[in-house]
């Protein structure tokens, strides 16, 4: 049955808006060419979207630069403002962007481990408000949060699985209270990093891959056939709890010590480096920075030491080999179950190891499994979480603003169809 005129208009409007998001400003002629719509239909939708305040003339094209065909249309970027929040054990990072995802301001603050719940929440919320003010955003339409822990698929609430600070779990509710007009949602940090790698990073050519997060702790995100897979309880990818050989005791339901976490988290990486005579300079920047320093330093020295060493592997070489041995245990487990074809070493430590560490892990996987698997190093590093949170917030805002009934409404489309506060959106569900 053919679509009704109103449905056809809505479909055409969304198609045009998506093209303007993906391609940037376009003329009516370019919209006609890209959409395949007739000239009158394009003229109608341009007028309709302009009246709704979603697009505007942003310039002219062509040598003569005059006439209706020369007008270039773009999304009204300040129609809505978005915030992305990256919550870590040691602090918070915030970025505020416009509707097309252009970052206008960003900042981060450390939060001490012994800070009370109230003071920690106040620091985090105040940072969001300050960055929004610096960005010139009078109000935030959408706030996307990335945090460690499990996100319940039914409620969208963050659940602790590894003894995280109480303020992590209370941040969504506190932000929603301080920003009552905003749509606030939370997603597991590693899932957001995978989204960023799929959209903007090294996995753009992959519909199926696994991201292995190597930062303060460990985690994994699973993307199969283009969709993120969360599992029945939202816990897909809790690889830190994977039992592994060589630890004093297996992990428990409340503590991942003794699991893969004990082999590949930043503290374990620093200890492994010290065992091989590779050490980082003393720093107050934290264990993640120390792990990044030892891995990056080893990568920088490995070529020279391989050439100079006559009596067995040099320290940097031995350290990277030992680290690759450890990472291969986790990667091989994922490969045996999922056969993803590609594993991305993500996070700050994955980026520090780069192609050198990725090649070592891939070599080991090639000897451990018959399933062909490419191992790649992230190019986004620790910034992937914030980027993924921003992409999720942008998707959610555009979903509301671009939908029929949401177009041009002063509340930005808030209504019965809007997801409830705290519900994670923006990534495909199984």
Model-derived regions: residue spans:
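Short secondary-structure boundary segments
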Residues: 147, 214-216, 347-348
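Glycine-rich phosphate-binding loop of actin/hexokinase-like ATP-binding domains
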Residues: 206-264
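Short glycine-aspartate micro-motif
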Residues: 72-74, 82-86, 140-144, 209-213, ...
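ATP-binding/phosphotransfer module of carbohydrate and carboxylate kinases, centering on a glycine-rich
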Residues: 1-61, 65-139, 246-252, 256-430
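Conserved phosphate-binding catalytic cores of ATP/NTP-utilizing and phosphoryl-transfer enzymes
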Residues: 60, 64-82, 185-210
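Short, acidic, Ser/Thr-enriched surface-loop or helix-capping motifs
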Residues: 98, 153, 223
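Short helix-capping/turn signature of helix-turn-helix
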Residues: 22-23, 200, 215
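Glycine-rich phosphate-binding loop and adjoining helix at the ATP-binding site
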Residues: 103, 108-208, 356-367
